[in-house]
Amino acid sequence: MSEKRELILKYRNDVVNGKKLTRSTISELFNINNKFLLNLSDAANYITRHFHGSKVDIEELANIKKNFCSEDCTFCSQSAFFNTKITGYDLPPPEEIVEQALNAKNDGAGSFCLVAAWREPSILDFKKVCVIIEEINKKVGISVECSLGFLTDKQARTLKKLQVKRYNHNLETSRSKFPEICTTHTYDDRVKTLKIARNAGLELCTGGIIGLGETRKQREELILEISELEPEEVTVNMLVPMPGTPLELQTQLDITEILRVFSTLRFLLPKSIIKISGGREVNLKDDGQKLLLSGANGIISAGYLTMDGNAIKKDTEMINEINLEA
């Protein structure tokens, strides 16, 4: 056995035995030669099975307020800064979202995330979202998560009282790349909201988008920055270049770079859910199973914020084909 393979096995066993790896070790794993990527992937899968068994977490999203966002994130087709021809709408009546939540539960989703395209909720909109959450709790009984932009302490505490389990707020990219991606708020603004959510007792979901034109080093920075927040869930999106956005001509990442991210994340956060999110069908096509055997143990199914996705039935079949449990 080669020295590199032996090292991967050693680090795998260290993680299984509860040892936290150093930043230099993580860098060594993340930048390993392509010929050892399969070994890295297998080790990440071993860690996943050890801590999570064969269960794959399935989540559905509801885009409860679409388009016309005030922020200028260059990847986003919902930004008011860009002409993307995406049809927008404001908050729908609660019964519409309740019906979506019920369908998600009946489909087999374990959680249902309310997502809104705005910088932060207004007082009135936040009250409306709270009514939606209350109705879902009464009539559906599915785990509710939220992604509502920036939060105040009071809003975070209110969500906790409403039994919201987890709050999503992505870092989007590494600190060093962020100023190229967004100018209407800062990286620290995003970290602040995550800390507010944590202090209110909410679980955290954070992550980012890979393939924004960042370097491999910046992807490494991103996963280290994510791990410092110790989120219960990590969501990794792969850019789908959207017409009308500044990144519409961006080249997609090679599968080997995507594997690096998921596999190394598992060494960093062995007990967290690591979720394959937006861009899965476009970027991976039939390679989604590879990521579920390379550190990932969750997916978003049945569509995204402005794009269709696989039906849960199809995703469940995909999961079962590799002897995992949906």
Predicted regions located by residue number:
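Core AdoMet radical
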Residues: 81-100, 104-194, 203-207, 232-237
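Auxiliary Fe-S-binding modules of radical SAM enzymes
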Residues: 1-35, 227-326
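Active-site cofactor/substrate anionic-group-binding motifs, chiefly glycine-
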Residues: 50-106
